[in-house]
Amino acid sequence: MNAKYDTDQGVGRMLFLGTIGLAVVVGGLMAYGYYYDGKTPSSGTSFHTASPSFSSRYRY
């Protein structure tokens, strides 16, 4: 019973840290697209296509 609880605790902590890490990465990419959108129109085409910014979404 105690080992099962420890396993669940570890999995929950791993998912929690993974979620935080993913949020940090997504936030960093969004900030990069926001600050550098329009400054480097020739680079990062695939990223700008998936960027939430409206100005970069219609740039092809």
Curated annotation (Swiss-Prot):
Location of the region described as Disordered in the Swiss-Prot/TrEMBL record: 38-60
Subcellular location, record wording: Host membrane
Disulfide bonds: none
Membrane topology qualifier: Single-pass membrane protein
Transmembrane segments: 14-34
UniProtKB keywords: Host membrane, Membrane, Transmembrane, Transmembrane helix
Regions of compositional bias (Polar residues) in chain numbering: 40-60
Gene Ontology CC terms: host cell membrane; membrane
Primary localization: host cell
Full protein name: Uncharacterized protein 004R
